[in-house]
């Protein structure tokens, strides 16, 4: 183990690696800023193009290409992190051999899709948007041809992002989407119109991918190129590990389809209420929980690669504590303020008070899903760090079966409608989280989550203070300042309780204020 640790130190010598806290900070900051810029981008698109077929086509084509490529690259990228980490322990040559081989595999997928889209755009229009006719059909074919290059561009980004994650360098990795949105916003401000929009979107993705590729080349003193012959033998092992993840991805898509299909038999507005609610709770889930789980994963893998299991468990516990620090108050705030939040976001025009009540109730039903799936992100990565992708797949399949059964029971037998489907998802998420914990404990031993129990209690105490403040001021204060005051009370309460995460953020705040003060002197 000591020799492995020395090897990692030698490999990392002279390289700047982020700490787990820094990695989480960069990932969350980049994701949040990207969301904000994405909102600005959408406002500009709406102002210039309105709700026309131009926007419909551009969004649909981009989503189709992103999803098709990501369906292949994402399941491979997850086990690629431990494989690359182990390769680094062997030698830099092994690391580069595996990375360039995977780049070759990814690029083949991208080139095949690029050729198919560029040569047969109408086939993709028929497959994914059969309702397009006339001028809309012609514009869709034009857009597919121009955006076909995304198939190759995305695999470049996916390869470099995985490599940077293994190197624990999260700065540009986290802000590449920010750069992409800035390019799109700049193009819109400088007069991009209907025929230039697909070119602008493709160019923005290209700028982001090139920035990643050049940065990686400068950092590593190595211009990575795809390898097409004599692939690294570990690619076979990688594909075997990726197999269950392909099934898991398909399972998640299938569950979404089943939810929507079952909701179609419920009263009008049920499908829409599920979608609207998911967009709201998806913000803390995507900006916080997903980013922290992704940023912590390479560190857990590195600990396991050097047989330092205790360190890996410590990192996993820290990641869960960091996730709970925001997810618990976010869940509580959404439970208490769901009607007001839905009202301020959606209630205008044809969206009535009755719609607000339905979406708010569904949103409250999803709160268990928000909490339990956030914790499960770390649990699954403990399996992945051990190169075990099969077990999480079986737990996922069991969760799918339970979710469908609960959908029928709560949504139809007990007549809870869309709210019942949301509750079913929360119960199934709790069962999956618990099952993942029990199976891991049986296979590998305890992770000692009780070591963070005291801090979790402090998070709960701060959340109770926040809830009391919200309930006390809810009838007298507007929703936006109420959210700010409630969250401030939570941070102060957890800091007074000396909760680790709160104290860490206060230290960061004091350092930033001190730097500003020194500059002003």
Residue ranges and their predicted role:
Residues 171, 179-210, 390, 398-434, ...:
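Membrane-interface helix-loop junctions in multi-pass transport and translocation proteins
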Residues 74-90, 289-308, 320, 379-380:
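Helix-loop junctions and terminal segments of transmembrane helices
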């Amino acid at each position: 183990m000591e020799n492995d640790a020395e090897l990692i130190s030698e490999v990392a010598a002279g390289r700047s690696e982020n700490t787990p806290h820094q990695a989480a900070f960069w990932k969350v900051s980049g994701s949040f800023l990207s969301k904000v810029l994405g909102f600005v981008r959408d406002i500009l698109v709406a102002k210039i193009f309105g709700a026309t077929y131009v926007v419909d086509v551009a969004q649909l084509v981009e989503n189709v290409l992103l999803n098709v490529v990501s369906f292949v690259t994402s399941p491979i990228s997850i086990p690629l992190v431990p494989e690359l980490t182990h390769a680094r322990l062997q030698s830099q040559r092994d690391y580069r051999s595996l990375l360039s081989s995977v780049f070759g595999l990814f690029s083949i997928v991208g080139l095949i899709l690029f050729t198919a889209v560029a040569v047969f755009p109408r086939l993709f229009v028929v497959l994914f948007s059969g309702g397009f006719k006339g001028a809309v059909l012609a514009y869709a074919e034009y857009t597919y041809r121009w955006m076909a290059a995304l198939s190759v561009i995305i695999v470049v980004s996916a390869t470099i992002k995985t490599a940077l994650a293994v190197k624990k360098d999260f700065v540009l990795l986290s802000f590449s989407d920010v750069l992409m949105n800035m390019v799109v916003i700049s193009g819109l401000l400088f007069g991009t119109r209907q025929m230039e929009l697909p070119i602008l979107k493709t160019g923005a993705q290209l700028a982001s991918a090139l920035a990643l590729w050049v940065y990686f080349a400068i950092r590593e003193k190595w211009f990575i190129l795809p390898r097409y012959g004599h692939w690294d033998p570990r690619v076979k092992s990688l594909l075997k590990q990726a197999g269950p993840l392909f099934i898991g991805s398909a399972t998640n898509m299938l569950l979404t389809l089943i939810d929507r299909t079952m909701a179609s038999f419920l009263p009008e507005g049920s499908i829409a209420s599920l979608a609207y609610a998911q967009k709201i709770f998806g913000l803390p889930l995507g900006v916080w929980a997903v980013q922290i789980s992704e940023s912590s994963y390479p560190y857990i893998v590195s600990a396991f690669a050097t047989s330092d299991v205790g360190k890996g468990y410590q990192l996993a516990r820290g990641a869960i504590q960091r996730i709970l620090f925001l997810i618990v108050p976010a869940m509580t705030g959404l439970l208490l303020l769901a009607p007001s939040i839905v009202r301020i976001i959606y209630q205008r025009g044809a969206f009535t008070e009755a719609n607000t009540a339905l979406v708010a109730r569904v949103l409250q039903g999803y709160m268990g899903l928000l909490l339990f799936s956030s914790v499960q992100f770390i649990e699954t990565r403990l399996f992945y760090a051990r190169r075990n992708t099969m077990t999480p797949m079986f737990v996922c399949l069991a969760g799918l079966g339970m979710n469908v059964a609960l959908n029928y029971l709560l949504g139809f037998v007990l007549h809870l409608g869309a709210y019942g489907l949301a509750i079913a998802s929360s119960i199934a998420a709790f069962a999956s989280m618990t099952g993942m914990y029990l199976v891991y404990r049986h296979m590998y031993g305890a992770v000692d989550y009780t070591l963070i129990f005291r801090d979790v209690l402090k998070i709960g105490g701060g959340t109770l203070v926040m809830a009391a403040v919200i309930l006390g001021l809810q009838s007298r204060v507007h929703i936006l300042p109420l959210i700010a005051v409630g969250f401030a009370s939570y941070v102060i309460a957890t800091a007074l309780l000396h909760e680790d995460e709160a104290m860490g953020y206060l230290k960061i705040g004091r350092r930033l204020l001190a730097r500003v003060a020194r500059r002003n002197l």
